[in-house]
Amino acid sequence: MEIKKAAMAGTLESSDAQVTVEPGAQGIELSIESSVIHQFGRQIKAAVMETLDRLDVKDAKVTVVDKGALDCTLKARVECAVYRSNDVTENPVSYTHL
């Protein structure tokens, strides 16, 4: 999925993360700001990159300001920001099979 315009999801509240995506030129440019970067930086990066890969995002500038978010929250924020960048208002994945 192509990042068509800048978009943001999340807040700067405790236990949340603010994720911003912008169009990129070559690959994924990831910037992470977190008070727990030394303990959980690799895990934060993995959650973000896994979500971008699942959504087939190849070129983007991604900024994450983490305030202690869980992996599921990080993934949801990345997904939401990517969908917003494409003006997608409904999740295109069907959950009727569950």
Residue ranges and their predicted role:
Residues L70-P92:
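C-terminal structural segments of small proteins and small subunits
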Residues T96-H97:
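Conserved small/polar residues in nucleotide/adenosyl-binding loops
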Residues Q43-V65:
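Conserved bacterial/organellar gene-expression machines centered on ribosome-associated P-loop NTPases
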Residues A25-S35, T63-K67:
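Short hinge/gating elements
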Residues T20-G24, E29, A81-V82:
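Protein-protein interaction regions
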Residues M1-P23:
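N-terminal basic/disordered segments at the start of proteins
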